[in-house]
Amino acid sequence: HADDLTRYGENFSSGGFNRLCREGVWFTNASLNYMQTTTPVSLATLSTGATPSIHGVVADRWFDYVGNKEVSLIEDRKEQSVNYSGGSGSYSPRNLVAQTLSDALAQQHPDSHIATIAVEPLSAIVMAGRSGEVYWMETLQSSWTTSSYYSKELPKWIADYNYQDQNEEYAIKRWTSLLPYD
């Protein structure tokens, strides 16, 4: 919810979200002339600020009548998973048409640190676009990974985290909210 930043603001450090709220632009009533359809279409709308007719994402898969084949939004046989041989990771943003906020930020401010972390690759890649660091959970290994499109190796901090097997430990724990819902 939009008001969650205000509601939970005292729990955040002075950097991060609180810095964005203090120094950034804050829209309290913004909307797009668009009806939510599927997750990849909605994520592309959020990450590009454009509607599907502009950003070109219609689903996570579609049929290309010209090429007479099914196309995946993120699957890309030219790429591989980094530090994992199970096949998951053959992904890239090559089928994304529009520039994302991350792409624009990288173009305007090349020294920016841009990272997207998600549970699965579709969300991570669609939100990031072509720029920055992109990581997702490789569920078969309970490890974080990325695509060779973004990096040839995992940064040391992620490799170290994966080596410690903390994800398996978290996977079996029951999640409970630290704060009350209301």
Question: For each predicted feature, which ranges?
Answer:
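Active-site-proximal N-terminal segment of extracellular/periplasmic enzymes that hydrolyze or transfer
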Residues: 1-24
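Extracytoplasmic/secreted envelope proteins and their assembly/folding machinery
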Residues: 2, 14-17, 40-44, 59, ...
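Extracytoplasmic/secreted cell-surface and envelope-processing proteins
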Residues: 2-6, 39, 124-128
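Second-shell loop/turn segments in exported
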Residues: 2-8, 32, 86-92
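Short helix C-cap/helix-to-loop transition motifs enriched in small/turn-promoting residues
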Residues: 14, 26-28, 52-56
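His/Asp/Glu-rich, glycine-adjacent segments
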Residues: 50-51, 56-182
